[in-house]
């Protein structure tokens, strides 16, 4: 997390998604079911790349709505920031990303979890970002928790079916 221009990172993110789309085409067990003729492969491949690029852009948008302090709270190991919200907030603030323990506790409560500290990996971080976006579209007291858990479920099902189809 740093401040700076979106260029070239937006294009790197889109290219990553496009490459993943290509990998989905060549390794997926569902691709042969979509192909009636060899000439259809190019369109299916490009469609996969475009959809993967869209997913990459959505991930970038979800990451950009997160406060950097929350991002570091979620992605830093417990050994570095502590399991205590007050100590974690102090460590993250000392890193240069001001945040207070009340914000960490409030965010955890909003998403229906006991804590958001040390939730390493992209899935929880993306889920919190998507929950922020979606709860703005459909407001409500419990909607943040709903969208957070929906995003986690969607990610898990998407990944599991992609792995299943690709193996």
What spans do the regions from the language model cover?
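Membrane-helix boundary/coupling elements in multi-pass transport proteins
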Residues: 16-35, 95-126, 145-167
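Helix-loop junctions at the membrane interface of multi-pass solute transporters
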Residues: 14-40, 44-49, 60-65
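Helix-loop-helix junctions that connect adjacent transmembrane segments
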Residues: 1-20
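Helix-boundary and loop/linker segments of multi-pass membrane transporters
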Residues: 2-4, 137-142
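Membrane-interface interhelical connector segments
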Residues: 131-136
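Extracellular/periplasmic helix-exit of transmembrane alpha-helices
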Residues: 50-129
